[in-house]
Amino acid sequence: MKKAIIGRKVGMTQIFDEKGKVIPVTVVEAGPCVVVQKKTLENDGYEAIQVGFDEIREKLANKPRKGHFAKAGATLRRTLKEFRLDDISQYEVGNEIKADVFGAGDKVDVSAVSKGKGFQGSIKRWNQQRGPMTHGSKFHRAPGSMGASSDPSRTFKNKRMPGHMGSVNTTVLNLEVVKVIAEKNLILIKGGIPGPNKGTVVIKDTVRA
């Protein structure tokens, strides 16, 4: 059965396995999330659950959001996400989803908005090669040719050029859950995940299982 939860990236640390080997892990505060709405085949044409995360004060929500949460009988949340799961019959509006839906050894996909790097050149942004730094060269970190001359007389779409780097939704696949601390709603995931500390992350069962 597929599982999913919304969380907040706390940061990275390291733990030791039973053989004393160091394992780098990312700590995620996962949930508690509340089921705000159920989408059904009859009403919506597909089955899914809508989940809210991160409680907020009433003054931070507009009237439509307040009404949406009041209908569900749930407290106001900052983040809303929709998950298409195999079987939504076990979920009811108002139910809580906590970190213990996952267990040690589970394989997950983690999605988050990557760190923004601002405007960057093509060397940093696309890992292009630079020119010679000495021997009379005047070409160092410039992007180089944009394309051919009279034919086609334009730069092709998607040409790798300098521009805004980062701040895009990124997914890392097939990461391992090392440990779940249910009483603190913490999930420890092996390796790094996208985004800054305190950023919102979505954890789902991996598609590569």
UniProtKB/Swiss-Prot annotation:
Gene3D superfamilies xref list? 3.30.160.810, Translation factors
Any one GO MF term held by the record is: structural constituent of ribosome
**Pfam families named among the record's database cross-references:** Ribosomal_L3 (PF00297)
Of the GO CC terms on this record, one is: cytosolic large ribosomal subunit
Record keywords, A-Z: Ribonucleoprotein, Ribosomal protein, RNA-binding, rRNA-binding
Transmembrane stretches, start-end = none
Q: Which biological process annotations from GO are given for this protein?
A: translation
Q: Where is this region: Disordered?
A: 128-154
Q: What protein family does this chain belong to? A: Belongs to the universal ribosomal protein uL3 family.
Assembly and partners are described as: Part of the 50S ribosomal subunit. Forms a cluster with proteins L14 and L19.
What is the protein's known function? Answer: One of the primary rRNA binding proteins, it binds directly near the 3'-end of the 23S rRNA, where it nucleates assembly of the 50S subunit.
Stated name of the protein: Large ribosomal subunit protein uL3
The organism named in the record is Clostridium beijerinckii (strain ATCC 51743 / NCIMB 8052) (Clostridium acetobutylicum)
